């Protein structure tokens, strides 16, 4: 295989590396990136990786992810590494970890939870109760959820 770059470097933005193979689209979904935002996104799937065997990579030009967005990625890509790029240089690099609080991103799986009532303006909120593997509890009904189950 050639050692050339498959996707060009980005001047400024975020590179999400070490995503398990086949999970890049799920990463975009949890970030709410649809392609209609006007942000340039590069997606590379199933490339060789010494660490994972195969991996996906997502590059988001012109946008640095918020800490909340970074940590919510752990729901679908727990091995992901985040690289913040400025002037074509990585200025920060870190691994994702489950957030302490997840608010308004997912629905509670309990059908009788008040957050699922059609006329109740209650935003679902989950608290982290265990890091490995991540386990959350709904603050309204007390139901436990693994992070991947919230998707």
Swiss-Prot record:
A GO molecular-function descriptor: metal ion binding
Domain of life: Archaea
Function: Involved in allosteric regulation of aspartate carbamoyltransferase.
Any one biological process term the GO annotation gives: pyrimidine nucleotide biosynthetic process
Protein name: Aspartate carbamoyltransferase regulatory chain
Cofactor: Zn(2+)
Subunit-structure text: Contains catalytic and regulatory chains.
Any Pfam family: PyrI
Keyword Zinc: yes
Family from the record: Belongs to the PyrI family.
ATP-binding recorded as keyword: no
Bound cofactor: record note: Binds 1 zinc ion per subunit.
Database matches in InterPro entries: Asp_carbamoyltransf_reg_N, Asp_carbamoylTrfase_reg, Asp_carbamoyltrfase_reg_C, Asp_carbatrfase_reg_C_sf, Asp_carbatrfase_reg_N_sf
Organism: Pyrobaculum neutrophilum (strain DSM 2338 / JCM 9278 / NBRC 100436 / V24Sta)
Disulfide bridge map: none
Keywords: Metal-binding, Pyrimidine biosynthesis, Zinc
Residues noted as binding Zn(2+) in the record, renumbered to the chain: 108, 113, 138, 141
């Amino acid at each position: 295989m050639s050692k050339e770059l498959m996707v060009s470097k980005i001047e400024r933005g975020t590179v999400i590396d070490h995503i398990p193979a086949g999970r890049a689209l799920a990463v975009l979904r949890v970030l709410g990136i649809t392609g209609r935002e006007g942000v340039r996104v590069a997606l590379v799937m199933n490339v060789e990786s010494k660490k994972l065997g195969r991996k996906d990579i997502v590059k988001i030009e012109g946008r640095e992810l918020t800490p909340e967005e970074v940590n919510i990625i752990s729901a679908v890509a727990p091995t992901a590494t985040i690289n913040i790029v400025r002037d074509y240089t990585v200025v920060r690099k870190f691994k994702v970890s489950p957030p302490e609080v997840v608010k308004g991103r997912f629905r509670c799986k309990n059908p009788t939870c008040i957050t699922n009532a059609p006329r109740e303006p209650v935003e679902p909120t989950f608290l982290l109760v265990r890091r490995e593997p991540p386990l959350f509890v709904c603050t309204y009904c007390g139901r436990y959820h693994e992070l991947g189950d919230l998707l």
